[in-house]
Structure formats: C-alpha cells, structure tokens
Regions:
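Fe(II)/2-oxoglutarate oxygenase catalytic core
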Residues: 2-267
C-alpha cells in the first residue's frame, strides 16, 4: 500500500504540473481518453496524506449525472448494512440505495476510477457502482467502508477480500438542500479558506471535516493500512439531510477480483 500511495501522489503532482505548464492552470488534464470515454478535466486537491484523502472537483460530467439518475429511477430500496459478507437492515442507515446497470456510461466512470488508482488495478476488483439517496431526516451513522468483523477475512477472501479504497461522489441534490454533508470526525480540518467551497468551515474544529454535497465532485480515500488491516481514521458518516434531498455514488475497490455473480454482466 505504501508504494502505491507514493506512486499515486507522484502521479497527481506530475499531472498537475503538466496541466499548468501547458497554459491551463485551472484544470488537471485527464490521464487518458479514448474514443468511447471522454474523461473530464477534473481537479485534485489533497486533503490528507495519512490517511490518504483526496478531493476530486468535477469528477462527474453533467451528462453522466443525468444518466445515472435516469437509469436508476424507481429502483431504490432501503439501504442495507454489509459487514463480513452479510447484509442487514439497521437503524444506523436510513437511506435508500440501488446498484447501477453497467452500461457504457457506467463503464467509463469505472475506467476513470481505475485510472486514478493506477494502471495495475483490474476492473474485476470493482464492486458494482451503487447510488444512495437521502431524503429529509435520512442519514448513515458513523462507519468504515472496510469490513470490521474479525471473522470476515476468511469469508471474504474468496470474494475479493476487503475494501481497499472508496470513492464517494455527489450525483444530484435539490436546490434547497441543507445538511447532508459527509463527516470524517478524525481528519484534521484544513486552514486554507479555499477549502470552504467544498467543506463546512462553520463546523467546530473538533468535529473533523464535513464535505458539502457539491454535485459533480467526489472524495477518494484509502481504507487499509499497508499491512492490510483497516484504518480507523477514515471513520465517516452521512449526516442527516435537514431539508431537500441528495443522491451520492459509491465506488469500492476490493483487494482481489470479484466474480460475475457479484459484479453482474455488462449491459
């Protein structure tokens, strides 16, 4: 993990320098675009190096966001909580969720997440892309994305292992939304006021970092220590929406490959 983290930080710094030297200092150039996938020139902002947490400005295009909401319309059900390969409904998570059919647009988003993590991460390590919808009063209490159950390692080793990394992107939100931020209580709040576009700078300093639900943007973080154990510092919560609604997107990368019975087919 440590060499991967160093390589990722070096790649981000190099890409940013190249973008600035080309005369376009406002946006990071995409690493790769193909005839099928035109990746946006999103910007990267490193919030924390340990644990690694990176903010991605403009990670999703308006067209992708509209497509995601359209193809998942009327498919949301009450969100389950998974740990150690089992799922259940709990009061700690009151949102609704749905898996997104892996069509061409979704495969492009998957490709973007893989390119961001380096060329050596196979597509089969990705869980199905998930959307989550939060209405007024709905929330997800403090949790980690990595499986905390001590017996989970044996059960999940045959199904991809633990969650290596996470993306959480903001797909849509109502104009009147209040609340609904993503809070990391163990992260140190940055001092630079430019972060106030993306985080709630009115929060008390001892509340950690709360990312605002800014549509199109995303947060990336690593879930595990170099030895493969879970990093408790990335504990986070989906704070209650006090008015309006929001839709977010989860992209989880596992340690190993997942079978088609879990990932599902291309459509």
């Amino acid at each position: 993990m440590a060499p991967f983290r160093d390589l990722l930080l070096f790649a981000i710094a190099t890409a940013t320098c190249l973008a600035q030297s080309s005369g376009d200092g406002d946006a990071q150039k995409p690493l790769v675009s193909t005839d099928e996938c035109k990746h946006p020139a999103y910007q990267t902002h490193i919030l924390s190096k340990s644990p690694l947490v990176i903010y991605l400005e403009g990670f999703l295009t308006p067209e992708e966001r509209a497509h995601l909401t359209e193809v998942t319309k009327d498919t949301f059900t009450h969100s389950a909580v998974a740990d150690g390969g089992s799922e259940g409904l709990r009061k700690t998570r009151t949102s609704q969720s749905t898996n997104v059919p892996r069509d061409a647009a979704v495969r492009c988003i998957e490709e973007r997440s893989l390119l961001f993590q380096g060329f050596d991460v196979p597509r089969t390590h990705l869980e199905p892309v998930q959307l989550v919808k939060y209405g007024q009063g709905e929330h997800y209490h403090f949790h980690t994305d990595w499986y905390t159950d001590a017996a989970a390692h044996a059960r999940t080793s045959a199904t991809g292992g633990n969650r290596l990394s996470s993306f959480f992107a903001y797909v849509a939100a109502s104009d009147d939304i209040t609340g609904g931020g993503t809070n990391f209580p163990m992260l140190e709040a940055p001092l630079d006021e430019r972060w106030c576009k993306f985080i709630d700078c009115d929060e008390p300093w001892d509340r950690g970092v709360t990312f605002r639900p800014v549509v199109g943007n995303a947060v990336y973080w690593e879930n595990l220590h170099p030895d493969g154990t879970g990093d408790e510092r990335n504990l986070h919560a989906g704070l209650p929406v006090t008015s309006g609604w929001k839709i977010g997107m989860n992209i989880w990368t596992r340690q190993g490959p997942l079978g088609e019975d879990i990932r599902g087919p291309d459509v």
